[in-house]
């Protein structure tokens, strides 16, 4: 089997996840067009590059993006860096003729996103984004139901993405809390996933109103530091939007949701039925079909749990009956991108999808006053 070389730009939390996803592909799929190999990792400092090599055994590590992109044995660059660096890496990868698999959100602004789009169009660069929630099996099934007409005309969309890890005021500043590096807070971090899912499942959105709050306005600059820095990004946000048919929608995101771990909820209501998904119950999709008969004691009507587990449509080695894990959607997303790289059909997020999400974020932040 032909092998394809992958270089990972950034080896923090999400870089590690992408490495695991690509390396896991041969253990999940029997139809791989290429065998992926992690051949290089770029980190911010030489010492962390050496640590990454010790942990992974990757043959090449560097702290230079140029060195990573210039290697002839690397064909795909995975962008897993803070948002402020996305444009630079995409530019260098495009000039070097590499394919790009970019983490979310696409960029810091619409201006940057459009520059990336121009580069992709001019160089015919193969470009994909890791909006992996498209590849949760239950979400995939929801897309099928919507396309088949089970929901009917969309009446309402409601989503929430809830974390609780930022409620401790002693938690120090990090790049995700620095506006000049992240571009935004909870909405950019968590809301980008929901914005993409809504766009993917039910179409375009127009932002109508948005609110945001920063609950802890100052944090230690680093662990145990007496120096405080101002926090200029949102801890909580709520965005009201409309679909093309004027159906209302709302998205709420929070990194201060006490008691939540990593909970994403999505509800889509229509003239014929309703779909509900909660990431804390990832093996199931709730489905209500209004066409089922009512009657004494309820008839046949009611929400039904569709058992999606790991029943992915591609040939894979893992039994579909097995409970699904969080990393599984990342693995499926990486598989889809590898298919795209090989010239096959893809349902993964494109740069145009990334631009739609960027527009959603930028409009929302302008209405919040977080520009």
Regions found by a protein language model. Give the residues of each.
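Glycine-rich phosphate/pyrophosphate-binding beta-alpha loops
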Residues: 192, 252-261
